[in-house]
Structures are given as structure tokens and as C-alpha cells.
């Protein structure tokens, strides 16, 4: 199994259990999230509670909640929305911190394509949800979620050069 960690913080952000597709010249990875129910679920065992005097809600766990699988699996923490100015400020700092950690061709490709990827994200800024890794470190990567028209499940966007592949 492969796990992808934030290169700056070491937070686990993704694994190969969630396939990705490259967008914006490979600078961004798009990963499809899915709403799931967490906690116990009602199991119908064929009994007729009304005939047996049981309560209709018997056996239902009130603690069951809906979560997005990626957020739950990697304990991503949602952040307040950014406006354009805040986002550009974050990206400048992130690029400054990440670039020296990249090597050779990866660094060159990142420098060449990050501006277009940033513009791509800026076009969606009003629709984005922002997440950080479990440590909630200020300098860590942001993970972006949004909803495509007609879809109930959000895709997530990762800045690919900021991820470090670890074999487990």
C-alpha cells in the first residue's frame, strides 16, 4: 500500500486506495470522495416490532453520521473559506516553503505549472472547501474539495508535488 504524506508536515493526506487523475499538467491530483455512513446501521432481521410490542426505532444507532470517506480516513480538518487575497498569500508562502524541498525535474515542472494551477483554483475559490492535515500546521498543504454540478459526492484536489510517497 502507498500512503501520500504532506512533504512539509508529514501528515498523511491520501493513499493508493483512492485513485487519482492528474489535472493542470500533473500539478493537481483529483480524487473522488464519497459520502459514507459511519457508526452502526439499522439491521432488519425480519422481526415485526409492532406485532411484538417493540419500539419502531429499536436497534437504530442515533450515533450514525454521514462523513466523506477521505476526510474521515485521513482525519482532515476543515478550515474557514479563503477569499482570493488570503488564498494568494497562502499560495505564495506554500510555494516558497515547498520549492526548496523539491528536486531537479520535479522542481522545474512545479515552478513552470504552479501558476496555472493556482489560477485554476482561484476560478473555483467560491466553491472550494479547504482542509488541512491532522496536525493543522500553518505551513502544511491545503486539500481542496468542491462539488461538480449534479454530483452528491465531492472530488478533492491535492497539490501533487507537495506529496511524498511512502510504502507501507
UniProtKB/Swiss-Prot annotation:
GO molecular function, one term: calcium ion binding
Record-linked PANTHER family: TRANSLATIONALLY CONTROLLED TUMOR PROTEIN-RELATED, TRANSLATIONALLY-CONTROLLED TUMOR PROTEIN
Principal location: cytoplasm
Keyword Repeat: no
The keyword NAD is annotated on this UniProt entry: no
Domain of life: Eukaryota
Name of this protein: Translationally-controlled tumor protein homolog
Record's signal peptide: none
Domain TCTP, first and last residues per copy: 1-168
Pfam families the record matches: TCTP
Keywords, sorted A to Z: Calcium, Cytoplasm
Disulfide links within the chain: none
Subcellular localization, as worded in the UniProt entry: Cytoplasm
One GO cellular component, as annotated: cytoplasm
Function, in words: Involved in calcium binding and microtubule stabilization.
Assigned protein family: Belongs to the TCTP family.
